[in-house]
């Protein structure tokens, strides 16, 4: 059992980080193994700007090796924030770069150093995740201070794959790193679909079945499908009990399995659109932000997509 949430500010910019943290705290009872968020359009100013989060070994010269690796693929480092969090011999570092090349090449360059592992890469998505509680997570990264257009979040109770930062949600697609997903449930035909995607050149970074969803949807969108069409395709192919929320730079999509075995509640107000595993997350936002939601539970096999107004 995990808790998932997606929020969108109807005017295109607002306290999305605070919305996510407040919602996730209301869902904390659904999982305490890890927590993560993706906040969109949080204010990158340079063209081709990327925010890279890495776990760097806390040893002399490690960050220098990472910097050299980034330069080797023509990445231009603009800022490094070291030691956002220190744990078990690793430093959680944030690196802002300007980069026009392949995200996969950048990922491989950093991983090849042997002293760092990539946690996330984003252009318009700012992704943070860690193995901790919502309250401690917010204390480390100050997520509640982030402004943005929309975002998704997750609290995890692990049932199958490992418990570490790399198995924490949100998951992203390396070819399309600003497509991210949070998921509650199980994908029972995971290995079959994974094999099919790998034959098409899709690379998986974990054995978490949730990662399959983002790759599947991103692949379908790369072939010309809209987010809504890709989600409808996905729920007809994915098997098992599931509900998920997926985000792109301009949209949030929500979907649940054909039997409706994992609940999702959506709420529409003049200021916020929200989807969450439980109504209590919506109630917190109503109370704290004076939102008046029109609520409904997602029907079996239903897909809903919200798009930013530009």
Regions found by a protein language model. Give the residues of each.
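Conserved short alpha-helical segments that host acidic/polar catalytic motifs at enzyme active sites
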Residues: 1-310
